[in-house]
């Protein structure tokens, strides 16, 4: 795996999400990066998954990071 830089992590949140997951009345955006044990990163309110952009280069070295945008934040949307 190529090492993820902070700039790469920032670009990750400018691009469309890897997948949209239906949850209740919403579609939750999920981005996945890294390799290793699965790690779920859930942001607080009123921010988005992009809040982890500086942390991702470090975590992605040893974990598969699944970063979600909660409904109403980032690329997620209510349906």
What are these regions (language model features)?
Residues 26-78:
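Conserved HGGG/HGGXW glycine-rich cap/lid loop of the alpha/beta-hydrolase fold
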Residues 1-20:
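An N-terminal hydrophobic leader/cap segment in hydrolases
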């Amino acid at each position: 795996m190529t090492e993820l830089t902070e700039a790469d992590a920032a670009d990750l949140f400018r691009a469309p999400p890897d997948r949209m997951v239906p949850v209740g009345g919403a579609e939750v955006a999920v981005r996945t990066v890294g390799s290793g044990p699965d790690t779920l990163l859930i942001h607080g309110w009123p921010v988005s998954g992009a809040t982890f952009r500086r942390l991702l280069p470090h975590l992605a070295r040893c974990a598969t990071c699944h970063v979600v945008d909660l409904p109403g934040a980032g690329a997620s949307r209510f349906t």
